[in-house]
């Protein structure tokens, strides 16, 4: 017979690193070119004028200006714009 108990095992004990997603700059706020506006998975927000989209769907400002959010179209698509100053 075994003189020691067998070691227990667990199937939990893992967690993923936080991804820091969300809106980083809000409507009416001034941004400089290259500033990140939204970090997202998929296109919850779409790029409007003067806004670019990175390969991970991050939205960023292409020019210095003021941010505005708008709901466009029949599908109520949320779009982000930057109005140059």
Curated annotation (Swiss-Prot):
GO function term, MF aspect, one: structural constituent of ribosome
NCBIfam families documented for this protein: L27 (TIGR00062)
UniProt keyword Methyltransferase present: no
GO BP annotation list: translation
Family, per entry: Belongs to the bacterial ribosomal protein bL27 family.
Disordered as annotated region, ranges: 1-21
GO CC annotation: cytosolic large ribosomal subunit
Upper lineage: Bacteria, Pseudomonadati, Pseudomonadota, Betaproteobacteria, Burkholderiales
A Pfam family matched in the record: Ribosomal_L27
Protein name: Large ribosomal subunit protein bL27
Biased composition annotated in UniProt, kind: Gly residues: 1-10
Annotated keywords: Ribonucleoprotein, Ribosomal protein
InterPro entries in UniProt: Ribosomal_bL27, Ribosomal_bL27_CS
Keyword Transmembrane assigned: no
């Amino acid at each position: 017979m075994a003189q020691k108990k067998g070691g227990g095992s667990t199937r939990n004990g893992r967690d993923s690193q936080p991804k820091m997603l969300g809106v980083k700059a809000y409507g009416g706020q001034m941004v400089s070119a290259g500033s990140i506006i939204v970090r997202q998975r998929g296109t919850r927000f779409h790029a409007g004028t003067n806004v670019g989209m990175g390969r991970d769907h991050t939205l960023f400002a292409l020019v210095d200006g003021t941010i505005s959010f708008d709901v466009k179209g029949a599908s109520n698509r949320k779009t982000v714009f930057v109005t140059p100053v």
